Every structure is written in structure tokens, then in C-alpha cells.
């Protein structure tokens, strides 16, 4: 395997790193105190000689009452001041963890969430003109009405892995290097990098993701497993040249716990990356990085976020999407060809899709804000990745593993619109469960899910925990089933992800043969659509959403170390092209006209978010 290593400029000086020793003190597994100023705003003052992110400090703030939200508080100390007992205990604990072999150790602070929202926190970390800076915001709405307990966000990954047709680029922003390799299976690259670390389970943090890899794996990622059967050379036209895989390693993450009304700012210390692998040096750098993260969340000038007025009817028909990669006649013809393959016994089912395009001057982040209103879903995603921005409201999990090493697959198939009343919902649920076509399609997908889970699970542990239950979402209801298994001892989350891609709900059955036919029928590559987007945490937890109901906004080049700019032109409004891809599951008795209309309706639901963004933000 040929490797070329080229030195490049570090990422941003602020993050590479605005982390000098002597910055804010933090505590391993124990949170720090927070000061509130006269306006009631949470503040953490940096020590003398440092600033929020760089350069000399401002004059010290007036002291106000100190509110401790933990049993122990830490105070900033200058080098000339003797270490306090609490600081000595923290250093000893950190050193003990390092001596036990842990080389990835988390520090964190927690603050009240009453003056901070996930949207505002994201804008504090990522400025309006930094649309190409890799970053993410993950939120959740359960049952269409209940906010999920956690929201996650982060920016400035320390490392990125980007793959395109076997060419893998590893960008190390901390060291300022770029390594290019040829890989037969790029999914293994992030896994191999992760093997360097023995992470320490954070004390006091909620049981959730708090740092690790975040990004997407596109539909075409599966080709690496079946290069002979699904070669890139026979794939549809690659008109956007987006990466097959794009992952960022985030050691600085902000976690909102909506149940306890707290925000956790987390930094993971890489002990081995410290000079000489020294634990004390790693702790000092970690304290500085954590301090910079906390300070970034409470800037002197709060970012301006237009309120956005919701004056349009959210149930009104959205603007029509007419620009597609397939005309209606072409789609109907492709459905007919698919049914011929089914009757010939080649396949049982195939998911046929096409891609719509919509131009708008609404900023992608404004579209995400509108999407949260229009279509709240279990997986609300705003992801700035290499070459594109993903704006998603996916209802469906691709795969999940937890710290107990349980593998979860939850196919969704079979859909009805929500009723206006509870009685209508109940009647629609009964109608959905009585639909033989919907049940047959769902049964095939459950079988595919059992097979995917079985490939990575211990014998005898694969179970269908729930079968054909109706789940309600904000605008629709779906038939859902849940398949679980116990992960084999020698496998990890990356193996689970490899086995799950792509989901049967976006490919068909049998999976590989269906994908071969999709290559023949569809006009362009799917890109992120039909793949997975989510996270793999340091502790092995993984949650990947299926990239459905996902808007893809092409941005720029995908192969450069990101650069941030204050150029006024980048702050001005520009025209964006938003891609919305949707598909329909074709079976033997499918009606071509109905299947086409299903794809149009699915895409239109996302177009409503663009309509709202344009109206609410006066675009």
C-alpha cells in the first residue's frame, strides 16, 4: 500500500490549538463551578495572561455570586500560584488513569442550559460564513412531539477520513498532515485509527455519545465489499463527485441534556499526543482546550440569529419540484423494467429512486431551522462535510450498537399519512396493517434485517423484539419492527456498519442483485442518499440514521484542509442548489403511477422546509 505524506498548514490557529497551559482548570469526572454575571449569564473567567481563544486577555470581569453546580469546584490558577488540593487530586486521578493504560481521557464542564439552545450553541462554534468548516448538529424528536433527551454538536475535527473510489485521504489537523492511501475497504481506516486509543469511561457524564467519529457513509460505500459484482466503473454517472465516505474525529463535543437542563462541554485528552506522552502535559493542554470550548459557547457578542416568522400554513401544499434526474415517463418505464425482473425471479423487490433539484437563496442552516418546524423526526441532522452540507430529518435507524454490545436494526416500511384526530389515526393504523402489499414488503425487509444482524451476532442471539408495530411521526405513520443481536466478541461497531450498508429499505432483495439493477436503471449516483449518517463514539457506541429525507447541498472541494474566511463576499447571500432524492419500493403488484407519485410526495415534504425558510427569513 503506497503512502504519501505531505505537510500542510495546521487547521485554524484557534483550535490548533488555543489550548495553552494555565487556562481553565477542569476535573476528570467532576464538574467545575460556573460564575453568573449581573445579567444572570453564565461566565467562566480565564486566568491572567490568556484570552478566550487567543492573545492577551481582557480586563477581569466583576465578580458576582458563584454558583456551584457540582459537589466540587475548580478554580483557575496561575503558574506562580501553588496548586490547590482539588487540583492535586485531579492531577493524581488523571495520572492514575494514564498509568492504567488509558490514553484517551475526557474532561468536562457543565453549565445551565437556560440561556443556550443547540441552534445558538452551534452558531457560537461555527460562524455564518464558515459553511465549509466540518461540523455537526444532531437533534431528535420522538413520536413527532417529544424532544429527545440529548442533542450533540461539535466543530473543528482533529482528524478526517475521506474516501473516493478506493482513494483515502486522512487529514490530521492537529499535526497539519495529509496522508493518501489506496484502500480496498475505507471503513476499516477509521477503525484502525481508533485502535490506538484505550478510552476511559467518563464519570458523571450521562450515558450517551460524548465524542468520537461523526459523518456519513454513502450508498456507494457498499461497493468496496463487492467490487467484482458492483464495480465503480458500472455505477451511474457521478455528476457531483461527492466522497463515498466522510468522517471527522471530534474530541471537543457539546452535549445538551434536555432532561436535566444542563449542557456538557467535553474535551478528550490524547495522552500519547502530549510531549513525551506525559500525563501532566496532556492534562494541561486538555484544560486549555476545554476552557477554549467553554469560552466559545459564551462569546462577548452573541451571534445574531434572525427569529424567523412562521406565517405560512405548515399543511399547505409545497412548491412543486420539477427538476429531476428522471422524467415521469422514464421513471414509469423503469418501474416496468423492475417488475419484469421480479417476474423473471431475479429479485423480489427493488427501491427505485430519482433526484430532484431546487435552487434557493435560503442558507442551508436556515433550511435546517425550518425543517425542525416542518418535519420533526427521530434523527434531525445538520452536517457540514467535505464537498456538501447534509440537512436531514430521517425517521429510520440504519444500525445501532450500545456499550452493552447489543446490535439493533429497525426496518420501517409501510406508510400512511397521519389523521386529523385520534380516531382517524386509529382507523389509518388498522388500514395500514390490513394492507397485504405493505405487509409483504415489510416482511421481506425484516428478513433482510435479521440477515444483516446475524452476520455480526453470536449464534442464537438474533431476535425479532417487535414485529409490525405502527409508529407515529409528525406527519406520517410507519410499520416498524425491531431486530436485535449480541455482537460477536471479536467484532466492533465498524463491522456492524459494514454489514448493514445499504439497508434493504433503500436497495431491495436480494440486496446485491437489486443494486446491480439499480445501476442499470438510475441515471446518477446516489451519493449520501441511502447510506448512513451519525456517529461512532470513543466508547464503542454507534447510532447511524438511514440517509432518507435528506437534503444534500453541494458546496466546494472535498480534498483540502479546510480554511475559514472573513471575506465579506462569503457572508453575502448566494444561490444554493439543494438536492432531494426519494424512492419507492417496487414489488410484483406495484402500480407505476402510484409509485411515481410516492416519490414526488416524499420529496415535496422536504421542499416545504425550503419554502418556510425563504418566507420566514425573507429570502
Explain the meaning of each model-derived region.
Residues 1, 7-9, 22, 62, ...:
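Intrinsically disordered, low-complexity regulatory regions enriched in Ser/Pro/Gly/Thr
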Residues 1-53:
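N-terminal chloroplast transit peptides
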Residues 74-619:
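Extended alpha-helical targeting/anchoring segments
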Residues 2-5, 17-19, 61, 65-83:
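N-terminal mitochondrial targeting presequences
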